[in-house]
Amino acid sequence: MLFRSRDEALARIRRPVAVCADESVHDRATLSGLRERYDAVNIKLDKTGGLTEALAMADEARALGFEIMVGCMVATSLAMAPAMLLASEARFVDLDGPLLLKRDREDGLRYDGSLVYPPEASLWG
């Protein structure tokens, strides 16, 4: 584990695999200064404040040369569903939050092996 306050060391090492910023990035304001340290950014709607900021953050991150990962916290499919808009253009997707719950909402995201599919329209009520 590397604490976000100590991630400056990443700028000095060669990385044969992509290193993704997670705790070091929360919104567009936190993107600056991370390009030399990370190859990708993990966008979580819970941390960005919602879909609008997450979409803007993805656009800005791509413009800066970052690869995009879409992640999540533990939550129901209702919380995950908006992230599917980002997932379609992300290189890495980790939307497994509903799988960690004892019971998810009806008509939520559908999982088949390593694939995740959008929810039924009835999820929205």
Predicted regions and their residues:
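Flexible C-terminal active-site loop/helix
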Residues: 73-125
